[in-house]
Amino acid sequence: MRFKFPLMAISLEVAMIVLFGLFVEYETPQNASQKNASHQNASQQGNTSSSAKKDQFFQLYPLFQDVHVMIFVGFGFLMTFLKKYGFSGVGFNLFLAALGLQWGTIMQGLLHSHGKEFHFGIYNMINADFSTATVLISFGAVLGKTSPIQMLIMTILEIAVFAGNEYLVTELFEASDTGASMTIHAFGAYFGLAVAGVLYRPGLRCEHPNDESVYHSDLFAMIGTLFLWIFWPSFNSAIADPGDHQYRAIVNTYMSLAACVITAYALSSLVERRGRLDMVHIQNATLAGGVAVGTCADMEIPLYAAMTIGSIAGIISVLGYKFFSPLLANKLMIHDTCGVHNLHGLPGVFGGLASIVAISWGMSTASMAMQAAALGSSIGSAIVGGLLTGLILKLPIWNQPPDEYCYDDSVSWKVPKFRELDNRFFQHANHNHVEHEV
């Protein structure tokens, strides 16, 4: 790893710099007004001034900042729940996101410009962050079981497949997916599951000693949950048309998330012994409402519909963690470390189906058939792309860690000589997590 990883990382960054030099320019007022025709009235575009375009940039920049925080802080800390994998969870999240946003900019820009030079503005910045979200979701499915080189390769391959599917959904199918329940969440989850299935190892089937949390690691992960929960309305509304569409996307997401929290807490207490809450459910299922409502967030659905979607998503997510994750691991040989299928996969599919129902009720001008095609395309391309990527990552040259060193920072990081985990531990009765003895 000492030479392979630095060489590949530096080579890729040099390639990014060259590609940006060849194809990317600043966005000017003239090309910005053409590019954002869908966001402005045509009669106003001819009079768009430089100051007006700057105003538009800075109007959208707060939404971009919110999405940026979700990508780097929210996803990063959500990955820190493993007791010996906190450095890798938040550290590799930063690395993959930084690489992914550059590659996502290139791939999406070239596809939408048909291979020609394109201009880089605020919408490109937001969409670049969106493209990295797919990788970070998939990263959760293989967390602790892959080397940095494998993660790097997966980022490059997955974003290429994602960009192709996103172009197909938005340009050819002309489907509505403002909050990206289908193109980001469902796609990222099933891509990651496909990779995890190919990389499955029987040695990790039984409980690995490092595949668990401790009190403080769950607390750090909860910080990620809170950042994601707070900023999710910005994620679902960032690329919505300004005005009523953006307003509806914010409000519907806000209420869907609130309703989701209530049902997630209720179901967590219901399915656990003695009615106690499971921190895994609270960290993840409370976010499912934001995932599920994403596709129809900007549609003219009533608030009670958004709340219903969020409530059902919370139930689906908790039940998935309790019953479906063990089934995936034991029967289908797919070990999903973070449970991305329950947070992103199932709620993402549910969100796509909800959008079809909303369209059938006349709440959007999109086509039901194209919406269904978009959902099928997102899942199908994710599974096929994930299987092929998994086969590439399975090659022995990529330094995949052996079973005994999985979920351990010391494989890739310099860790402090003294760690809390070096002290004695005890386990409370009827408690699944190891806790530090005081």
UniProtKB/Swiss-Prot annotation:
Entry's Gene Ontology cellular component terms: ankyrin-1 complex; membrane; plasma membrane
Record-linked InterPro entries: Ammonium/urea_transptr, NH4_transpt_AmtB-like_dom, RhesusRHD
Record: glycosylation sites: N31, N36, N41, N47
Membrane-crossing segments per the record: 5-25, 62-82, 87-107, 122-142, 149-169, 179-199, 219-239, 250-270, 279-296, 301-321, 343-363, 373-393
Summary of subunit composition and partner proteins: Homodimer. Heterotrimer; a RHCE monomer interacts with a RHAG homodimer. Component of the ankyrin-1 complex in the erythrocyte, composed of ANK1, RHCE, RHAG, SLC4A1, EPB42, GYPA, GYPB and AQP1. Interacts with GYPB (via the N-terminal); this interaction bridges the (RHAG)2(RHCE) heterotrimer with the SLC4A1 Band 3 I dimer complexed with GYPA.
Compartments (UniProt record): Membrane
Residue intervals annotated with topology Cytoplasmic: 1-4, 83-86, 143-148, 200-218, 271-278, 322-342, 394-438
Reactions catalysed according to its record: methylamine(out) = methylamine(in); NH4(+)(in) = NH4(+)(out); CO2(out) = CO2(in)
Pfam families the UniProt entry points to: Ammonium_transp (PF00909)
Protein name: Ammonium transporter Rh type A
Purpose of the protein: Component of the ankyrin-1 complex, a multiprotein complex involved in the stability and shape of the erythrocyte membrane. Heterotrimer with RHCE (RHAG)2(RHCE), that transports ammonium and its related derivative methylammonium, in both neutral and ionic forms, across the erythrocyte membrane. The transport of NH4(+) is electrogenic and masks the NH3 transport. Also, may act as a CO2 channel. Moreover in erythrocyte, regulates RHD membrane expression and is associated with rhesus blood group antigen expression.
Native source organism of the sequence: Mus musculus
Modifications after synthesis and translation: Glycosylated.
Membrane topology qualifier: Multi-pass membrane protein
Biological processes per GO annotation: ammonium transmembrane transport; carbon dioxide transmembrane transport; carbon dioxide transport; erythrocyte development; inorganic cation transmembrane transport; intracellular monoatomic ion homeostasis; methylammonium transmembrane transport; multicellular organismal-level iron ion homeostasis
Homology family: Belongs to the ammonium transporter (TC 2.A.49) family. Rh subfamily.
Keywords (A to Z) from UniProt: Ammonia transport, Glycoprotein, Membrane, Transmembrane, Transmembrane helix, Transport
Gene Ontology MF terms: ammonium channel activity; ankyrin binding; carbon dioxide transmembrane transporter activity; leak channel activity; methylammonium transmembrane transporter activity
Signal peptide span: none
Extracellular compartment segments: 26-61, 108-121, 170-178, 240-249, 297-300, 364-372
Phenotype reported upon loss of the gene: Homozygous knockout mice lacking Rhag exhibit normal growth, development and fertility. Mice exhibit no significant change in body weight and body mass index.
